[in-house]
Amino acid sequence: MKQDQLLEYLEHFTSVTDGDRLAELIGRFTLGMGYDYYRFALIIPMSMQRPKVVLFNQCPDSWVQAYTANHMLACDPIIQLARKQTLPIYWNRLDERARFLQEGSLDVMGLAAEFGLRNGISFPLHGAAGENGILSFITAERASSDLLLESSPILSWMSNYIFEAAIRIVRVSLREDDPQEALTDRETECLFWASEGKTSGEIACILGITERTVNYHLNQVTRKTGSMNRYQAIAKGVSSGILLPNLEQVVVTNFPKLMQ
């Protein structure tokens, strides 16, 4: 694909605001790169037990139906690996990773091949607010390693823009379906110190407010995040990116080590 075409896709992915339009754009890009299908799973940690999962794909309907009906998401080896690494996953080398997979999970790939999904490359994606994505570009034939290796730099580059577009679209949809109040600065401060294991009394001393006020703010956080208690609110705060590490007092390690 020529450079001007790639830049055009980049602009489209940066500005797209509709899920169906995004699916169409990914499909066109996939074909232009020499692949037959794509499959893109976006996982948003609304809850550890029931995260929000959105699938964009251009795979055969028969495969989508079989995959969904047999609950293959939980045993999909691509999903398993993508949640543990950031490097691309080459389908024709999955056997080398078998020891890291659930027993029998490679059967999913054998079944996929029967439906015409025979080779591909998958990119694990990780967002700033705890989102996970897995974008796969797939061939109907057992493509040579040359195609996978030669196209992977461009696919990896563009995957990040596709990922950001999907997050933007899905997050807007979630806010429209279930609008949530934003946390105030003080609520975020209380949640931050609670995540550090501080009691309400200790947080009160740190922030110079009363313990009763701390409990009020943490109760507000619990309500706004739809949590059962402050511990679940902490988990949601960490997974969603509301809570971020404080970099003001960090100890920095340099490599190579600086001269004394």
UniProtKB/Swiss-Prot annotation:
GO MF annotation, one: DNA binding
Keyword tRNA processing: no
Keywords: Activator, DNA-binding, Quorum sensing, Transcription, Transcription regulation
Disulfide bond sites: none
Record carries keyword Transcription regulation: yes
Domain named HTH luxR-type: residues: 176-241
Superkingdom per UniProt: Bacteria
CDD domains: LuxR_C_like
One of the GO BP terms on file: regulation of DNA-templated transcription
InterPro entries: Sig_transdc_resp-reg_C-effctor, TF_LuxR_autoind-bd_dom, TF_LuxR_autoind-bd_dom_sf, Tscrpt_reg_LuxR_C, WH-like_DNA-bd_sf
DNA-binding region in chain numbering: 200-219
UniProt similarity note: Belongs to the autoinducer-regulated transcriptional regulatory protein family.
Function: Functions as a BHL-responsive transcriptional regulator.
Protein name stated in the entry: Transcriptional activator protein AhyR
Gene: ahyR
